[in-house]
């Protein structure tokens, strides 16, 4: 079991499990537990972030298009469960330049170690056609920003009116802004989307804003017991 910290409180939450399938095919059930955290517990520099960021969690506001508006045009809110790995180590004296081809090679390496399968049961009408990230200025501005990279296909969802929706795996890239001390960061955090949980009536912070430099008072982090093995390094 490990603990996933959320960027903010939920008004409603239904307990869910995500099933990890290791390379040898053996399933590992991992129970998700959501808690809140503030930036007072964020490391002030990069010294602890290797352990700090091995796993992560971020919430987005998403909207689905079905050809016609349903549920008064309301957006569905989802939480993306991710597994992360540092793609670039810091280099003293300047930022690290890491090409897209290098990142894609890193992704290809990571894909050898884990596959995923997850289905989310949604309340009400099931979104079915198109998944897109919306733009919002009120996104919780954490120490990292999320950026899509081109060496993996877009997230795709499938579902029907029964309320069951599946999601394919994908990769994203976090570029570090530094810790709460404000130090510049020259690391990239590579994360893999491994599942989606549908949550109704969630307090929404908005979606990814790559251009914002603001810090946030609440953010996402993971607390791992020492005996949990890393899936890849």
From Swiss-Prot:
According to the record, the segments passing through the membrane are 78-98, 113-133, 188-208
One Gene Ontology cellular component annotation held by this UniProt entry: membrane
Its record classes its membrane topology as:
Multi-pass membrane protein
Per UniProt, subcellular location reads as:
Membrane
Major subcellular site:
membrane
What keywords were assigned to this record?
Membrane, Transmembrane, Transmembrane helix
Note, other: Partially overlaps CDC6.
- Name used for this protein in its record: Putative uncharacterized protein YJL195C
What species was this sequence derived from?
A: Saccharomyces cerevisiae (strain ATCC 204508 / S288c) (Baker's yeast)
């Amino acid at each position: 079991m490990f603990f996933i910290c959320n960027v903010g409180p939920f008004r409603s939450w239904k307990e869910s499990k995500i099933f990890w399938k290791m390379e040898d095919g053996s399933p590992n059930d991992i129970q998700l537990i959501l808690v809140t955290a503030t930036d007072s517990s964020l490391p002030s520099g990069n010294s602890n972030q290797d352990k700090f960021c091995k796993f992560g969690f971020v919430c987005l506001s998403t909207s689905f298009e079905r050809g016609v508006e349903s549920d008064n045009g309301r957006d569905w809110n989802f939480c993306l469960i991710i597994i992360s790995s540092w793609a670039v180590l810091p280099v003293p004296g300047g930022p690290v330049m890491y090409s897209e081809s290098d990142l894609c090679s890193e992704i290809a390496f990571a894909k050898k170690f884990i596959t995923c399968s997850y289905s989310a049961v949604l309340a009400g009408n099931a979104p079915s056609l198109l998944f897109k990230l919306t733009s919002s200025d009120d996104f919780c501005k954490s120490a990292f920003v999320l950026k899509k990279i081109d060496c993996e296909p877009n997230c795709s969802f499938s579902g029907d009116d029964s309320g069951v929706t599946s999601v394919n795996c994908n990769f994203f890239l976090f570029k570090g802004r530094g810790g709460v001390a404000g130090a510049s960061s020259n690391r990239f955090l590579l994360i893999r989307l491994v599942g989606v949980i549908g949550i109704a009536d969630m307090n929404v912070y908005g979606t990814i804003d790559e251009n914002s430099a603001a810090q946030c008072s609440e953010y996402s982090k993971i607390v791992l017991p020492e005996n949990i093995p890393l899936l890849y390094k």
